[in-house]
Regions:
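ATP/NTP phosphate-donor binding region
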Residues: 1-109
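A short, small-residue-rich loop immediately preceding and capping a beta-strand
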Residues: 94-132
Length: 132
């Protein structure tokens, strides 16, 4: 939880943020950052998957983290009900029940790899699903 003072009428603001990593090589720190989570749901769009999402999958696999990835298709991903619906529906993927790793169909962490639209959509989905 972060908390900060502000000059607005609310005076104090809070956000349920566990941490933030801004550094060179931040992708390589993902296993340490997500040490408390075992089922990672990675969400990216086509562009951000090519830029970093594929590497994130490799890092999670090397760290022994169970994960699955949703790549939102299309030239432009919009922050709308369709995008949110895809994220939430895939989080509950019934096919995951047959995963040989006994991956529960519900992840315990949503990892957004991407742009403002991907991040904002994942933030709302995680709120709706009560996931970090």
């Amino acid at each position: 939880m972060i908390e900060f003072e502000c000059s607005c009428d609310m005076k104090k603001h809070r956000a349920p943020l566990e941490g933030c990593e801004i550094s060179s090589g931040a992708l390589e720190k993902i296993p340490q950052i997500l040490a408390d989570y075992s089922k990672i749901y990675v969400v990216a769009d086509e562009n951000t998957y090519a830029a970093a999402g594929k590497r994130v999958e490799e890092i999670l696999k090397a760290a022994g983290k169970h994960h699955r990835t949703l790549v939102l298709d299309g030239e432009t991903v919009l922050p709308n009900v369709e995008t949110l619906g895809k994220i939430i529906l895939f989080a509950n993927d019934p096919l995951a029940k047959s995963n040989i790793f006994e991956y529960s169909p519900m992840p315990d962490f949503i990892l957004a790899v991407g742009s403002g639209t991907v991040n904002d959509s994942c933030r709302l989905a995680s709120y709706r699903l009560r996931l970090p």
